[in-house]
Amino acid sequence: MTLITDIRLRRVLDSRGNATVEADVLTESGGFGRGKAPSGASTGEYEAIELPANEAIAKAREEALPRLIGEVHAGNQRDVDAALHAADGTDDFSGIGANSAVAISMAAAKAGADVLGAPLYQHLGGTFRGNEYPTPLGNIIGGGEHAADATNIQEFLAAPVGAPSVEEAVFANAAVHQEVHDILADRDLPAGKGDEGAWAPSVSDDEAFEIMDEAVETVADDFGFAISFGLDVAGAELYDDEADGYVYDDGVKSTEEQIEYIAGKVEEYDLVYVEDPLDENDYEAFADLTAQVGDQTLVCGDDLFVTNVERLQAGINADAGNSILIKPNQIGTLTDAVDAIELATASGYESVVSHRSGETEDTTIAHLAVATDAPFIKTGAVGGERTAKLNELIRIEDNAV
């Protein structure tokens, strides 16, 4: 362990052109780490609070840096993150901002790894690390909060579950992305791209399912291994209190109809992953869907759990879902994220590590996914801020970090 001697904070751009927080952590023995905070578009009601970048930086300089510089060792992540909590003084990081907190937390972890001369995933891994690598979930067709005039379902995700290596999986997802482009072109369907690089055509959800199914089948035949797909439904964005149901272009589905609809799609397309299929406050509906299809697919809580151990425990008690999405900025520190993963693992839930729609070239989540033996990592298929993580996964597998 080595004492933190300086922390530098600045504004940088994220992938949407918005300001975010970058942190540098330096130690007395020459260790260095840099972390950048991502930002979400489809955010859960219970997420940690992100402040405007300038405000988050000013608050962190005033409250957090004096508790860290000359006081805490970079190699002790739990102490670093406890100091961030103490500096903030709230339960949602509304004091210094989750964006400043997570940037500092990630930078300190990297500085600690740098001092040890170890890859970040080894520094974070502890007893988690198994022999497998996460399968990347590639966002191929997008709508919802990520793209206007597109599908109601927010993400259609390629899942190369049969890939023999991370490298093959990454290139398979890129090929599915290109194949969907070609299918759209053949159908004279123009499509721009959403926040995460997914195609955003003006098609119905049913046509998007059909296109994805055709694309993954074609690419699976070309690559010679199984490729499935999954969904991020973003159910909280579809649910409307006044309508008392899930609002689609073709009408409103009741909770019972939404459960039946998603369960039917799992059966029809053999989906391997379904994220936030229902509203973020409806543990009972999540439990009902999990009882129906939980032995066939991962029913993953993102807005439902927000990387929060208390909300996860409530879900475990209710048998709601069978997996949790892990987003460090959603809870504010790496320690909080790892605590959620530990609880999930102990309770038989899988943990899926994820990017945000507003991303940076930071690669911390690639290391976190490897360190914690995650079955999947959500980090897009194309775009520099996405491929930064994917290429890092390839390097990790090749022992080149």
UniProtKB/Swiss-Prot annotation:
A GO BP annotation = glycolytic process
Q: Which CDD domains match?
A: enolase
Q: What does this protein do?
A: Catalyzes the reversible conversion of 2-phosphoglycerate (2-PG) into phosphoenolpyruvate (PEP). It is essential for the degradation of carbohydrates via glycolysis.
Query: What's the catalysed reaction?
Result: (2R)-2-phosphoglycerate = phosphoenolpyruvate + H2O
UniProt entry tagged with the keyword Coiled coil: no
Q: How is the cofactor bound?
A: Binds a second Mg(2+) ion via substrate during catalysis.
Q: Where does Mg(2+) bind?
A: D232, E275, D302
Pathway-wise, it operates in:
Carbohydrate degradation; glycolysis; pyruvate from D-glyceraldehyde 3-phosphate: step 4/5
Q: What is this protein called?
A: Enolase
Keywords assigned by UniProt?
Answer: Cytoplasm, Glycolysis, Lyase, Magnesium, Metal-binding, Secreted
UniProt GO MF annotations: magnesium ion binding; phosphopyruvate hydratase activity
Positions bound to (2R)-2-phosphoglycerate: Q154, K327, R356, S357, K378
- Spell out the subcellular localization from the entry: Cytoplasm; Secreted; Cell surface
Q: What is its EC number?
A: 4.2.1.11
Broad EC category: lyase
* Any one GO CC term of the record: phosphopyruvate hydratase complex
